[in-house]
């Protein structure tokens, strides 16, 4: 799961995106062209992902909601656990509900920054979620330049760092210096996120699981 993602990927036609790992995955995958987030804000959208229900149905549409879920609502990983799957979440649990703690307890065998399918019993089927924060607005727009250089640009080669002056500015944005800077930072973060996706795909290969695992991005 990536945060604050627009279709800023090569496989969706963004000529400025450098996302070789996701693009390679897309070439051998089903590519959704008419799929949209259930809600435009992160926590309400996450409540949809964990329950499989629209925030308008669960009462979780208000950001930072403490509203309880409708009676009997379960997180869908609970059903996977019932079926014998080892379920892991790495690591965000911002489910925007008074029931968030219960969802964490009932949905996940492991939920932490160390959660991984490799912690399961060998041959046990698994469902593993990895939440990549690097494209979150707090990183793309808020981090001071020094932190951004350390956490993002230091992981990219000079050719992979996006030059604000060379980016294509979508017509719905004003073509200003500030907008170009924001777009460049965002594209850099997405490039690092792509590296992280590549690392997970490599781990599946190393474990001999690549041909037996369904990967959703």
Question: What residues fall within each predicted segment?
Answer:
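Formylglycine-dependent sulfatase
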Residues: 1-217
């Amino acid at each position: 799961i990536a945060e604050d993602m627009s279709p800023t990927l090569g496989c969706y036609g963004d000529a400025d995106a450098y996302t070789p790992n996701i693009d390679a995955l897309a070439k051998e995958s089903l590519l959704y062209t008419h799929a949209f987030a259930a809600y435009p804000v992160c926590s309400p959208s996450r409540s949809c992902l964990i329950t499989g229900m629209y925030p308008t149905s669960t009462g979780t549409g208000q950001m930072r909601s403490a509203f309880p879920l409708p009676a009997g609502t379960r997180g869908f990983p609970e059903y996977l656990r019932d079926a014998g799957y080892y379920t892991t979440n790495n690591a965000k649990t911002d489910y925007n509900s008074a029931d968030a703690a219960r969802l964490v307890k009932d949905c996940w065998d492991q939920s932490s920054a160390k959660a991984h399918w490799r912690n399961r019993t060998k041959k046990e089927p698994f469902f593993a979620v990895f939440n990549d924060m690097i494209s979150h607005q707090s990183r793309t727009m808020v981090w001071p330049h020094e932190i951004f250089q350390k956490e993002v640009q230091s992981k990219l080669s000079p050719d992979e760092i996006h030059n604000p002056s060379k980016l294509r500015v979508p017509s719905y944005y004003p073509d200003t210096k500030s907008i170009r800077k924001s777009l460049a930072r965002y594209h850099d973060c997405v490039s690092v996120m792509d590296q992280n996706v590549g690392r997970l795909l490599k781990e599946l290969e190393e474990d001999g699981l690549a041909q037996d695992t369904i990967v959703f991005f």
